[in-house]
UniProtKB/Swiss-Prot annotation:
Keyword terms: Aminoacyl-tRNA synthetase, ATP-binding, Cytoplasm, Ligase, Nucleotide-binding, Protein biosynthesis
GO CC terms of this entry: cytosol
Protein name: Proline--tRNA ligase
Function: Catalyzes the attachment of proline to tRNA(Pro) in a two-step reaction: proline is first activated by ATP to form Pro-AMP and then transferred to the acceptor end of tRNA(Pro). As ProRS can inadvertently accommodate and process non-cognate amino acids such as alanine and cysteine, to avoid such errors it has two additional distinct editing activities against alanine. One activity is designated as 'pretransfer' editing and involves the tRNA(Pro)-independent hydrolysis of activated Ala-AMP.
Organism: Idiomarina loihiensis (strain ATCC BAA-735 / DSM 15497 / L2-TR)
Keyword Protein biosynthesis applies: yes
């Protein structure tokens, strides 16, 4: 490709509304242009990268015998009404009407459409197992689209769905898909972690997320420093402290305190936050003989709402009471565990405390020297906190480390949630009608592009992994339009590289060398070859890798083989 025939629209300045590095660099490198909030046009440079992601994803899906299809982005409401999600889905679902006033929607996901297809086309166990995938545009009407294509309203996604008669068959496909995802991210040159995850609104049982590690990531990942264990923080088990709870040494004392913040309350008591408790009042499950229950944690720990919502005693969705006087008679900072009016669900770390401080269940009062059982009623020990760095790893090996991650893939074992609702089944070998069990496997194709930039950039621009770069090589001729010799050498090099199947950009613009170098470094082409008069005097060209290293003089006759070795 010649720059003179190419849409190369770089920016010198960073747009003011671009918050994270990938958004800034995608705009400056001319990869995307904003159309409206969360909506972007992909330019030729951006689309070249996007297509490279697509190609790797497609190859790995086909390698595990997944069959590609294409489903409509616009979906009829009646299918979503059949599954129950028309009413359950929130405002992220963009609902529209056609000219006949029939309800439709822009698809955020395609479980209903794929279920309808399989329901109509698959009737026998002999057609199973079956895995279908597509690479298709999705739309979710985010309340606050931000970070460019990282959290856009319209995005490109690969979604695959598998159908099985048995859980064992589903598990095999799930394992194959897990390995395929690992190969995809390895081929794309990304530093990633597969993590145990919550199934969320999609539903189902087993689930893994795939995260690209980056400081700008929205998700916290807990992983072991001594094993392959990794989990989303919301799913990582917080192990109970080892050993017996210490014996009581103090008597209970009451103190008058002031302030609404925990730190202000604890300071005059000379109590550290890890030696105090805090409480949350939440709505109880219907079968509990109380309208509310009290969740108790160590004061230095964070409540894990996903874990809390899964407790049998807690109503789902989790409802944390803000006006606590209604349930306890006191304001939130003064809720404690002595003479508690509600059932107590105590995190295991808090349950290991002795001689601790807590609210006195009287406004303006706190207690010190409190001990479980001696001073409290019955309680249940649960795991309801987020793990923190330094905790024992849930796998039993090493300590927990915490990193930020960008979710770029998610796989689920859906079970029969959708196939039951949509009546998707086949005749088994015995002639009996059997409901199918499903798997669901998503990759954020457009999000991968942004995540890769978050992981691969410097002060000059993007430093693409080889597999993702819009071009593999750029030829930068010095003053080509004034030197026939430079033009001839650059043209021949361009022709020879193309003949070898190398993806090359020939920067033949009438621009100053400084502008050309700045643009190419910003775009992030991995290999740069400079053709100039001085080096041609010695039958040489100059080579430099975008990721650094010394400039090298390469014999012009050896240039093609040298570039091939670098690739």
């Amino acid at each position: 490709m010649r720059s003179s025939k190419y849409l190369l629209s770089t920016l010198k300045e960073t747009p003011s509304d671009a918050e994270i590095v990938s958004h800034q660099l995608m705009l400056r490198a001319g990869m995307i242009r904003k159309v409206a909030a969360g909506l972007y046009t992909w330019t030729p440079t951006g689309l070249r990268v996007l297509r490279k992601v697509e190609n790797v994803v497609r190859e790995e899906m086909e390698a595990i015998n997944a069959l590609e299809i294409l489903m409509p982005m616009v979906q009829p409401a009646d299918l979503w009404q059949e599954s129950g999600r028309w009413d359950d889905y929130g405002p992220e679902l963009l609902r529209i009407k056609d000219r006949n006033q029939r309800d439709f929607l822009l698809g955020p996901t395609h479980e209903e459409i794929i279920s309808q297809l399989v329901r109509k086309e698959v009737s026998s166990y002999k057609q199973l197992p079956l895995t279908l995938f597509q690479i298709q545009t999705k739309f979710r009407d985010e309340i606050r689209p931000r970070f460019g294509v990282m959290r856009a309203r319209e995005f490109l996604m690969k979604d695959a769905y598998s159908f099985h008669l048995t859980d064992e068959s589903l598990q095999k496909t799930y394992d194959d898909m897990y390995k395929a995802y690992c190969r995809i991210f390895e081929r794309l040159g990304l530093d990633y972690r597969p993590v145990i995850a919550d199934t969320g609104s999609i539903g189902g049982s087993h689930s893994h997320e795939f995260h690209v590690l980056a400081s700008s990531g929205e998700d916290a990942i807990a992983f072991s420093d001594s094993s392959d264990y990794a989990a989303n923080v919301e799913m990582a088990e917080a192990l109970a402290p080892a050993g017996e709870r210490p014996a009581p040494n103090q008597k209970v004392e009451k103190h008058e305190v002031q302030g609404d913040e925990l730190a202000a309350v604890l300071q005059p008591l000379s109590v550290e936050s890890q030696q105090a408790t805090k409480s949350f009042i939440v709505k109880a499950a219907d079968d509990i003989d109380s309208e509310y229950v009290q969740l108790v944690l160590r004061a230095d720990h964070e409540l894990n709402t996903v874990k809390a919502e899964k407790l049998a005693q807690v109503a789902a969705p989790l409802e944390i009471l803000t006006e606590t006087e209604k349930a306890t008679g006191v304001e939130a900072p003064y809720i404690g565990v002595v003479n508690a009016k509600l059932p107590l669900l105590v995190d295991s770390s808090a349950a290991h405390l002795a001689d601790f401080a807590c609210g006195a269940n009287e406004n303006g009062q706190w207690l010190t020297g409190v001990n479980w059982k001696r001073d409290t009623g019955d309680f249940s020990v649960v795991d309801i906190r987020n793990v923190v760095a330094g905790d024992p790893s849930p796998c039993g090996q090493g300590k927990v480390k915490i990193a930020r991650g960008i979710e770029v893939g998610h796989i689920f074992q859906l079970g029969k949630k959708y196939s039951d609702a949509m009546k998707v089944g086949v005749l088994s070998e015995s002639g009996k009608h059997e409901t199918l069990t499903m798997g669901c496997y998503g990759i954020g194709v457009s999000r991968i592009v942004a995540a890769a930039i978050e992981q691969n950039n410097d002060e000059r621009g993007i430093c693409w992994p080889e597999a993702l770069a819009p071009f593999q090589v750029v030829i930068v001729p010095m003053n080509m339009h004034k030197s026939a010799r430079v033009q001839e050498a650059a043209e021949k090099l361009y022709t020879d590289l193309k003949a070898q199947g190398i993806d090359v950009l020939f920067d033949d613009r009438k621009e100053r060398p400084g502008v050309m170098f700045t643009d190419m470094e910003l775009i992030g082409i991995p290999h740069q070859v400079v053709v100039g008069e001085r080096n041609l005097d010695e039958n040489q060209v100059e080579y430099q890798s975008r990721k650094g290293g010394e400039k090298q003089k390469i014999n012009l006759d050896d240039c093609i083989s040298f570039i091939q070795q670098q690739l």
